[in-house]
Amino acid sequence: MSRQKGCALFLVFAVTLASVPSAMAQRKRRAPSSGGGSDAPSGATSTKRSSKTSVDASLSSSGGGQPLDHGDKFYSQNNYFAATIEYAKVTDESGGDELSKQSAEFKMGKTLYKLKFYSAALSYFDRIVQKGASHPHYNETLQWLASLTREMPDSAGVLEKIGKYDRAELDNPQLQTVRDELYFLLGKFNYTKNKFKESVELFQMVSPKSPFYVQAKLFEGATYVREYNAKPAVDAFKEVLRVAEESSDPKIRPFQDLANLSLARVFYSTKQFVLATKYFDRVSPESYDWPNSLFESSWANFMLQQSGYSKALGNIHTLRAPFFEYFIKPESAAEALTVKATIFYYNCLFDRATDAIDEFMETVPSVKDGLVKVLKDNQDNAQFFDIAVKIRSGKSKLPPLVERAARAVLTDKSLAKRFEYVRELDKELASHDKADSAWKSTAVANNIFSDIGVNRALMVNEAGEMARKRVERLVDEFKQLHNRVIKIQFEILEGEKKQTEEDIRNETPKDRRVREKEYTVIKVDDEHQYWPFTGEYWRDELGYYRYRLKNKCGGKGGMPDQIATPDPAEGTPAPEDGATTPAGGEAPVPTENTQSDATTTP
C-alpha cells in the first residue's frame, strides 16, 4: 500500500487489531447466574458428549416433573444433547408459561455453547437481546456474548448484540468479573460505528489491572488517529509501551510492536520523519509486521533525503531476502522498487535507476495479469472462496509468483478469522453428523443443522467477497505503481539527456567523476564489524544493511519536483520526544552496492 495513503495505513491496523492473539484475556470466570451451579464459559470448553441411552432417556421421559427441570438435570450431568431436547420442549411449546420459555431460551443458548454449536447458541442469545431488559436473563447473556467473541469473527454479529446494551447496564453487579472486557467490547462496537467520543470513554474505563487494558489503549490511540488528533494518540500508544516495559508477560510483546508501529505512522503523518524512523526501528524482528515496518521505514528515511537514503536502500535490500517471501505485502515489495529507482534518480545514478525499473517490469505486470485472470475465472463469491482456500494452502496450481502475491493478501488476520470460522462451522456440522442418531431425529437437532448450514453459506459468501476485494485492491495497487513507473522512466530519460548535454557543454566525463560525492557515512562501534555483502543473506544481519551511495549530480542531489513524492497524512502536530537519530542507526550491516562496504553484527 502506498505511503501516499499515510494515515490510512494505520487504519488498516485499527480494523485488524482485534485479531492479535488474545489468549492473555482468556481467563476463567464465575458463571452467569442461571438458577444455581457454576458453568462459566471459558476460552477452552470441554464438551462431554452424551451416550445413546441418555438421549433415549430424554426422548422417553414423561411425567414426574417439568421439561425445564429435566433439562437442568441433564445439564448438571454434562449430558448436553439430552438437555437440548428438554429445553426445546419448553421453547417450542405454544401457549406455555412465558417465564419458563424465557428461562429455557437462556439455558438452551448456554447448552449449545457447551456443545460448541456457537452459531446456534448466538441465535438463542439474540432472542434475549431483542427482548431487552424485560427478559430476566438479559444481563447474564452479556457474559456469554463476550465469550462468543473469542469463538466467532466480528462479522458473525456478536458485537452488534453487545452494542444493544447501554453503558449503564454494564454496572450490574452480576457482570463484575467481566465488566472490563465488556467496556472494551462495547467501545470496540462504537468504534466500528464511528462513534468515537463514546468509544474513547469506554476504552478509558477499562482498569489498568485488566488483561484488556493494553488492547483498550491501542484502540483508544487508533480512535484518536481516526479523528486526526495526534497528541492523545501518541499518549495512548506510549502508555502501551510503558505497560509492556514493566511487564514480564511475553504475550504483551505483540501489542508492544503494534504500539511502536502505530507511533511511527503517527510521526510520519505529522512529518516528523526522524521520530518515525526511531519507532519503525523498534518493531521486533519476531513481529508479524516487521517486514512491512521495514518497508514503511524506507519511506520515512527517503523523506530524510541524503541522511536517510543509505538506510532506505538497505531496508529494501533486506526485503529481497528469501526469509520475507510470504511475509512482505506484494504491493509493498513492488513499491519498494519504485522507491529504489527514485533514490538512484535523485542522485543521478540513472543506470541503477533503470535496473530497478527493469526488475519491476519483469515481474509486476505479469503477476497483475495473472491476478486479473483469477478474478475473471472466479466471479461467484462461493467460487472465489474455493480458490482462495487453495491459494492459502499453496495448492491452487497458479503460477508461483501469482499464487505468492495472492496468498500474501489473503492471509491478513481479519480475513483469516473468517476462513477459520468456516472451518469451525464445518467442525460443527461434523459433530452434528457424529451425534447420536436418536438426537439427530429431533426437531431441535434439525433446527441446529439448518442454522449451521445457513451461517456457513453466509460466511462463505462474505469471506469470498472479502477475498475478492483484497485481490482487486492488489490489482489496483499494481496498476497505480505501473503508472508511477512509467513517469519515473520518462524522468530518467530526461535526466540522462540533460546530463549528456551538460557533459558536452561544460566538461568531460572525467571531470564529472571528480565532482562525484559520497554522502553516506557508515559508523561502526565496538559491537559491530565492517563486512561486505557477497550475495548471501544471514538471518542476524537482516535489518542492518546500509548502502554506500554516491551522488553524481555534482551537488547535493535532492528531490526534484518532476516525480511525485508521498504526501503524509494530515493530523495535529505530535510532541517531540527528544530523539534526534533513528534507533539502530549505529548498527549498520552489508550493502548491495558493488563499490560498497558494510557492517554486520558478530
Model-based region annotation:
Residues K28, S58-L59, D92-K101, I128-E140, ...:
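Short solvent-exposed coil/turn linkers within tandem alpha-helical repeat scaffolds
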Residues D69, K107, W144, V178-E181, ...:
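"A position-specific structural signal for the A-helix of alpha-solenoid helical repeats
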Residues Y80, Y118, S155, F196, ...:
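TPR-repeat structural position
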